[in-house]
């Protein structure tokens, strides 16, 4: 796990022996389950350390020291897949509450298994779509941090994510490649859903060679009750425009 250890140090993170052991076990279980569940195309030991584990931990750069120390810090990972970035963030922030949301039951089975194997507490695995789950009182506007590595465009992600975020919280979207046009197109959705663009942070880590960004959006007022719209609508008719 040396690549992960070195990269994490550049983020200001010094992983403990326990955390390193958890990441090793995570890797072993990921590769083992991937043979039948098709969780990821990345299985090389070095690449998992950087492209999955380290990449997930970069979300920490979007958080303040005060936020990291909050005893009631809560995270929801939308479309988490094999648990990225949610589980690596939970390993780093063991005191946090984490919800892992994915629409696929097979992935949820793996997630529940890995949560138990890593002995992570205060973690809930939820099977469902963001469009529906965000309207449930238990989840709506109830999280400090909303994260997603999903490949959907930013206007779509904003509609799905911001309703989960409480006032004063953040949505952090992890993006690769050109993001400028996406951000322009998402400006209306950000405003409509109660957000405000905080910053777009380019990641400068040699371990992550391709262009990666954190798009950080603050939640400043409540999302209108009608959002997100019913399943599939945000994808078919995203809120696109400039405010």
Predicted regions and their residues:
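Conserved SAM/SAH cofactor-binding pocket of Class I
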Residues: 57-152, 158
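Short alpha-helix immediately C-terminal to the canonical SAM-binding loop
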Residues: 107-109, 179, 183
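Helix-to-beta-strand junctions that scaffold the AdoMet/dcAdoMet cofactor pocket
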Residues: 93, 165-167
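Short "lid" loop at the C-terminus of a central beta-strand within the Rossmann-like core
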Residues: 131, 176-180, 205
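SAM/dcSAM-binding transferase cores
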Residues: 184-243
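Class I SAM-dependent transferase core
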Residues: 1-76, 106-109, 113-123
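Conserved beta-strand signature within the Rossmann-like core of class I S-adenosyl-L-methionine
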Residues: 168-178
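Short loop/edge segments at beta-strand edges and connector loops
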Residues: 17, 127-129, 201
């Amino acid at each position: 796990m040396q690549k992960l250890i070195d990269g994490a140090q550049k983020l200001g993170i010094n992983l403990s022996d326990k955390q390193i052991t958890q990441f090793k076990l995570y890797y072993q279980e990921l590769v083992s389950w991937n043979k039948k569940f098709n969780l990821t195309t990345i299985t090389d030991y070095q690449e998992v350390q950087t492209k999955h584990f380290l990449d997930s931990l970069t979300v920490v750069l979007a958080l303040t020291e005060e936020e990291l120390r909050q005893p009631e810090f809560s995270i929801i990972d939308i479309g988490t897949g094999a648990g990225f970035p949610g589980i690596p963030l939970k390993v780093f922030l063991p005191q946090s509450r984490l919800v892992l949301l994915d629409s696929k039951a097979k992935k949820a089975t793996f997630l529940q298994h890995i949560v138990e194997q890593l002995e992570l507490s205060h973690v809930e695995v939820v099977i469902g779509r963001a469009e529906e789950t965000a309207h449930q009182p238990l989840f709506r506007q109830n999280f400090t941090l909303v994260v997603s590595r999903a490949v959907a465009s930013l206007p779509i992600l904003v509609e799905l994510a911001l309703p989960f975020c409480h006032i004063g919280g953040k949505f952090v979207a992890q993006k690769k490649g050109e993001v400028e046009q996406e951000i322009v197109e998402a400006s209306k959705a950000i405003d409509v859903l109660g957000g405000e663009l905080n910053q777009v942070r380019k990641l400068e880590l040699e371990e992550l060679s391709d262009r990666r960004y954190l798009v950080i959006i603050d939640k400043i007022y409540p999302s209108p009750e009608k959002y997100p719209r019913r399943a599939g609508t945000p994808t078919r008719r995203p809120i696109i425009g400039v405010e």
